[in-house]
Amino acid sequence: MTTVYYDQDVKTDALQGKKIAVVGYGSQGHAHAQNLKDNGYDVVIGIRPGRSFDKAKEDGFDVFPVAEAVKQADVIMVLLPDEIQGDVYKNEIEPNLEKHNALAFAHGFNIHFGVIQPPADVDVFLVAPKGPGHLVRRTFVEGSAVPSLFGIQQGASGQARNIALSYAKGIGATRAGVIETTFKEETETDLFGEQAVLCGGVSKLIQSGFETLVEAGYQPELAYFEVLHEMKLIVDLMYEGGMENVRYSISNTAEFGDYVSGPRVITPDVKENMKAVLTDIQNGNFSNRFIEDNKNGFKEFYKLREEQHGHQIEKVGRELREMMPFIKSKSIEK
């Protein structure tokens, strides 16, 4: 049964008197740090020199190299990209951990797959907002919040649970609700959602729809409008009220087509393929492939990225977006 915690459920402020080091000052890092600071906590930033280092200073934080930030902290929240966490942990975090420090993450990848293996005498917890950093920050300022997940991997001090919930409250998450989970569940469901649906599944569905229309002789511009541009209209309806809201809002023709043609596209074989994707996540095949490719300079990753960048749908999209000044268009430089 799902357990959800709110402000009133966090009885003890286990962060009181503790120094928090936020390692990283990107999307999640700036939101966590600023929300904690606004709630009165002692926050320092650990980061390497660069734009984010300068931005954190501009925002009024004490900023240090990662090792120095960790040395002075009781709670260390690691908010770096998955692929660099392992090296930063090994070289800058682990040598400076002390007994009963708390090591925290917003995604469980490196803990769950064993890239990072903390010593047994530190707490390890997860607080994972279910939204991007700018939304975590904006909703906090507005007095609301983004729902979040939390979980405990190890509790050496006996206070890991209280610290995790206090941290979740500190970034504002308990205003909306914090769902209890595990590193395993958070990691595997997050990766599956990205690969099978949100990123991999949707991108290939759109691309295949575009190719089907163009190969049948239809204008690429019309194909783009029908399978990519209008996707936002449907996703917004889904976001606001689920599939029922989509079906309530679209025409009867579209709804009928949903029922009779959807199962022809997403067949039982597709679900079996999804299960295979999930299995590769669960057994470590995907993580091993990602980790090894990272060690080899991301040769496979960059090759795949370049292949997708050259697809016709991207060229058509760039041209059509110039006709729509109401869209805040983004061109990704290569």
From Swiss-Prot:
One of the GO BP terms on file: L-valine biosynthetic process
Positions with a binding annotation for NADP(+): 25-28, 48, 52, 82-85, 133
Domain KARI C-terminal knotted: 182-327
Keyword Lyase among record annotations: no
PROSITE patterns: KARI_C, KARI_N
Similarity remark: Belongs to the ketol-acid reductoisomerase family.
Protein name as catalogued: Ketol-acid reductoisomerase (NADP(+))
Native source species: Staphylococcus aureus (strain NCTC 8325 / PS 47)
